[in-house]
Amino acid sequence: MADPKLQVALYWGAACGGCDVAVLDTDEFILTVAEVADIRFWPIAVDGKYADLEAMDDGELDLTLFNGAIRNSENQYVAELLRRKSKVMVAFGSCAHLGGIPGLANDASREEIFHRAYLDNPSLEEGNVTLPVTEKKVASCTLEIPRFYRRVHKLADVVAVDYFVPGCPPAPTQVKAVLLAVVQGALPPIGSVVGAGERTLCDECERRKEEKKVKRFQRPWQTIQDPDRCLLEQGIICAGSVTRSGCGVRCPDSGMPCRGCYGPAPNVHDQGAKMISAVASIVDSRDPDEIATIIGEIPDVMGFAYRFGLPASTLQQSVRSL
C-alpha cells in the first residue's frame, strides 16, 4: 500500500505573491509535489475558506509554508490557526522570516500611514476624508475588517516557527529542499534555516576584491561598472558582506548589488547595523564635511540597511504592542 500523501497548506500574510509563484517556479518538480502531497489550502490558487481550516483536526496538516509578514489581525488569526493545524510550520520567504519589505512601514506610525494613504494622497478625490474603521453597521448587518496593527511583525513574533526559508522570493532549490526534507523524514534541528548557506554571499561571489575605499556612492544606473570588480569597491552599495549565502549570487552575477533578502549571515546579530558599519568603514576621507557629503549621496539609508529585516532588528526589539 502506498504511503499516505503529505497534507500541505500554503498561505500569504502581508505579501506580494512572489513566494507563491516561487513554488510554481520549481518547474517539473511540481509534478513530484502532486504525487507525494495534497495541497489542502492555498488561497492564491484555490478558493478555500477559513471554515475549511477551522474544521480540520489539530495537527492534521503535515506542513504549512507561510509567506508574508503579520500586518493585521487577520494575518495573526490565520497564522495561529495554521500553527494549531500543522505539524511543521515554515516561515517561507523574507517577509515571514524577517518582516520583509512591508516591515519598512515600521519607520512610520499607523497614523502617518493612514494619513498618507487616505487623506494626503494625490490620487484621492478632493474632499475625501474617509478613514478605515474595523466595524461598520449597514442596513442588514455589521461589516468587519481586520485591525491594522501599529507595527509589522515577522511570523515568529506571533507563533512558534519550526523552520525558516529565506529569500525574496526563495529560490526553487530551497522549495525543493524543504519539501524533500519533509517527505524523506530528514528535517534538520528545529529553528534551522533551510536551503541556504552558512557563509556570506561575499564568500561565494567571484568578483575581484581589492581595497575598499570610495569617494562617492552611486546607484547601478549612474555608472558603467566593471563587471569583474566588487560592486562595493565601485561605490555601489551591496549587502553581500552581511547577508547569508545560498542564492547562487544571482544579483551580483547579473550586475545588480545584493539587497540582503536572505537575511543576516551566521553570527551577524543585526544585518542593518552591520551594513551601515561596512559602508561607513570604506569612506575614503577624514574630513567631517566631506564624509557628510559622501554619505549624503545615499538616498535611503533605512531602505538600504533594513530593506528586508527592520521588524527583526534591534531597533524593533523593544516594540511589543500589536
Placement of each model-derived feature along the sequence:
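Iron-sulfur (Fe-S) cluster-binding modules
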Residues: 1-65, 76, 80-88, 107, ...
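Short gly/pro/ser/thr-enriched loop/turn and capping motifs at secondary-structure boundaries
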Residues: 95-102, 120-123
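Short glycine-rich anion-binding loops that position phosphate/pyrophosphate groups of nucleotides
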Residues: 69-71, 95-97, 170
